[in-house]
């Protein structure tokens, strides 16, 4: 007997746009092409097709609105109003975030965007921090890592004597793969809430938690930092963790195990590798872009692939580029707007 069964087929009477896909340089997949133009069938498949129940699938609910398919007006920069502004003015409603960004000079924009996460952290053992720009009232953001909770320095010595003067204790939670084995989003959300409370207590605002990418092999170097080999499980668990931590801190949507350059098909990118990020995009307020090239397009260079992902997922949170390249004034302003909007929403800032 066969080990597989005919699931069904889809016939479209008119076009439907369900994903904002962009053309990519696809690798050749010869085994998926058949000269006869039909898929392989067993002799009894035709009888099963005739007897199968017909079910109509409506794509209208998933069809993207026409306004999202059109390319909007090109961003030409923020227009200043001739006055000096701070982040407190934006928070109190005296000006918009666009006026603040327009008032900032290029040097401070580079400190905020290009130097994000590269400053020494005030929390011992943390990964880093963003620059504190006092002129515009922009505070420093403390960033910590750790797939099983906050990875910080427990014993803090005195700089002169070397003696332990105080301790900061962070809880070590089960590994992401163990939490994912429960298939319980409430459990993962509770873990995120507990980590968020520790973030508020220890002065951390951004947490690079478990890797959102799929677990391709148990022999991976970052096996202990990932959820599962299933993209749906990875996405739902990441969203639950970020949702639990959000009232107190921000869990960053990120993937640290991608190679420097990879070539994948559009279907594999959308349905396997990119699906966890699409699922988790609604629950995450910050995302760290990997400095890698996917089918010749770098995500950190405002590529068509990145713009399509932002449009398809409807993601409007902060984007943090994992690279040191400098950008022009327009690019710096676009990145600074996302960072400042996140700061206005984040707690303890």
Regions found by a protein language model. Give the residues of each.
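Glycoside hydrolase catalytic-domain context in secreted enzymes
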Residues: 1-4, 9-349
């Amino acid at each position: 007997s066969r080990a597989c069964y005919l699931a069904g087929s889809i016939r479209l009477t008119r076009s439907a746009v369900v994903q904002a896909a962009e053309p990519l340089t696809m690798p050749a997949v010869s085994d998926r092409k058949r000269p006869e133009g039909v898929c392989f069938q067993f002799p009894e498949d035709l009888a099963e097709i005739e007897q199968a129940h017909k079910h109509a699938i409506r794509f209208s609910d998933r069809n993207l609105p026409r306004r999202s398919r059109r390319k909007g007006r090109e961003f030409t920069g923020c227009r200043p109003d001739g006055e000096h502004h701070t982040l407190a003015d934006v928070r109190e409603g005296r000006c918009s975030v666009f006026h603040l960004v327009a008032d900032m000079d290029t040097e401070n924009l580079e400190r905020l965007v290009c130097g994000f996460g590269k400053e020494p952290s005030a929390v011992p053992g943390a990964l880093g921090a963003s620059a504190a720009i006092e002129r515009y009232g922009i505070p420093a953001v403390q960033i910590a890592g750790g797939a099983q909770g906050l990875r910080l320095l427990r014993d803090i010595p005195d700089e002169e004597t070397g003696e332990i003067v105080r301790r900061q204790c962070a809880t070590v939670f089960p590994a992401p793969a163990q939490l994912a084995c429960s298939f319980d989003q409430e459990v993962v959300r509770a873990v995120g809430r507990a980590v968020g409370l520790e973030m508020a207590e220890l002065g951390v605002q951004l947490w690079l938690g478990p890797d959102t990418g799929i677990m391709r092999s148990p022999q991976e170097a970052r096996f202990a930092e990932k959820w599962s080999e299933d993209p749906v499980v990875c996405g739902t668990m990441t969203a639950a963790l970020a949702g639990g931590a959000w009232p107190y801190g921000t869990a960053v949507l990120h993937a640290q195990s991608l190679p420097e350059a990879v070539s994948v098909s559009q279907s594999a990118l959308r349905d396997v590798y990119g699906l966890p990020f699409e699922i988790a995009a609604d629950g995450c307020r910050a995302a760290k872009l990997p400095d890698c090239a996917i089918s010749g397009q770098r995500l950190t260079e405002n590529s068509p692939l990145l713009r399509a992902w932002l449009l398809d997922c409807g993601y409007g949170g902060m984007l943090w580029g994992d690279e040191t390249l400098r950008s022009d004034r327009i690019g710096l302003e676009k990145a600074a707007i996302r960072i400042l909007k996140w700061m206005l929403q984040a707690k303890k800032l």
